[in-house]
Amino acid sequence: MVAGEGVVFADLFAADAVLTYPFAPPGQPRELRGRDAIRDYLGAMEQARELFTMDGAESVVRETTDPEVVVTEITHHGWSHVTGAPYRFTALGVIRVRDGEIVCYDDYMDPIALARLLGRTGELAAALTGA
């Protein structure tokens, strides 16, 4: 998904999977239900890839005591074409896998870093203050 292949990433989800964004900024859905909805949303988000150049990504995967659940920390960095500055973005994913498919993915992304990356800090501030 970090590499801009959201539609392909969606194929890893079960037909009735749920993708959540608990810290979703204004204008972004907090929950997507079903592989098709996930594919449609991630496909639409691929246009945002034109706003930045990713130079690298790192991930750390942590096992849990639940054999169906892994926790992953994904950080990518590069250049924001919107701000003309380097960026660093980290998200934490709590992923439940059953029968080889993702059934639930809770994506705890940093909405402030995302707003900076996309040049939308003003929109985020206005949404938070009601301005």
Predicted features, each with a name:
Residues 1-5:
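Short, aromatic-enriched amphipathic alpha-helices that serve as compact interaction elements
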Residues 7, 12-68:
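A solvent-exposed, acidic/Ser-Thr-rich amphipathic alpha-helical stretch
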Residues 46-131:
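A beta-strand edge to alpha-helix "cap/lid" segment located at domain peripheries
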